Structure formats: C-alpha cells, structure tokens
C-alpha cells in the first residue's frame, strides 16, 4: 500500500507490500539511498500483484495488501479500473519454512540455503532489509509469535539466525535486522 491507503506493515512506496521505506531526504545532501524494508519471517511478505501506469508509476490501491483490495473483500467498493496502458505485475516470493522447523533440521547449511533464497529475491525485487530473522527464545508457550523464533535454546537460536543471515548476505546490498 502507498500513501493514505496503506496498511500498517505494507507502506512502501517503492516495493508494493513491503513494510516501509526510509526517508529520501538524505539522498541529495548525503548521498544515502532509501532502504526498503520487507517483513515476513517465512520469506519476504510482499504484494503478489500491483499495477503501474504507462510511465512506470505505481497505481495506489491495485496491490493485494491495500485498503482498496480489503474493501472489495468486505463486499464494499468496486474493482479499480486501470488507466489505458497500465500493466499488472506479479511478484511471488518463496514460502520458506518457519524458523522452528528450520532449527529442527539441526543443519545450519540448510538454514543458510534458505537465507540465500531470500537474499536472491531481495536483490531481484529491490528490498534492502529483511525484518527477520526473529531473534527471541521460546520462554512462554502462550507467546503467539514463537513460530518466528528458532528455539528455546539461546545457542541454537543464535547459530540458526547467524546461518540465515550469512545466506542473505551472500547478496550485495541486502541484509537482515535480527
């Protein structure tokens, strides 16, 4: 989602469905480029589709993580008509197994390969930072996000997160945010 119609967690103006972007204010005076942040503990969570006009500008409300799409699901509103020359794009990301399952393999090479898949998709889709891997330990079984964390053992959790990060960082210009 973009602008006023964005959904929390999908507010990127540069990569539809990404969690957000950093400010553009530092490009001119400090030559610091925007960073695009994508969520998703089991691979990148991005919009599966979006549309752009004939000049390549994103058309707000056409991606599947927008309020425009949600109002259609609720039975309100009408499908947005695309302007002449608009193109619909698709960006399907790989669904990586959840962290707990990856840790249960006891194989840091497999976890690094999963990170490599995510890093390749980040490069391809222009995402700079992956808001993962989740780094916590399973202290309470009532925690609703334990599936995002590798283990209740801090050593196992750290080794797994490091392997995932190594896999992602095989690709220049992308990283994780443990």
Indicate residue ranges for each PLM-predicted region.
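Glycoside hydrolase catalytic-domain context in secreted enzymes
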Residues: 1-178
């Amino acid at each position: 989602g973009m602008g006023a119609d964005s959904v929390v967690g999908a507010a990127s103006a540069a990569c539809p469905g990404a969690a957000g972007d950093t400010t553009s204010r530092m490009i001119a005076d400090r030559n610091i480029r925007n960073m695009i942040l994508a969520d998703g503990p089991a691979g990148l969570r991005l919009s599966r589709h979006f549309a752009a006009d004939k000049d390549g500008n994103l058309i707000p409300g056409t991606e599947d993580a927008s309020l425009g799409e949600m109002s259609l699901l609720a039975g309100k509103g009408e499908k947005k008509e695309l302007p002449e020359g608009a193109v619909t794009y698709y960006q399907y990301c790989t669904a990586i197994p959840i962290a707990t399952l990856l840790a249960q393999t006891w194989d840091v090479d497999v976890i690094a390969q999963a990170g490599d898949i995510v890093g390749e998709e980040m490069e391809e889709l222009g995402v700079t930072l992956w808001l993962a891997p989740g780094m916590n330990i399973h202290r309470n079984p009532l925690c609703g996000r334990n599936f995002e964390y590798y283990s209740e053992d801090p050593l196992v959790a750290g080794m797994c997160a490091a392997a995932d990060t190594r896999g992602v960082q095989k690709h220049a210009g992308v990283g994780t945010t443990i």
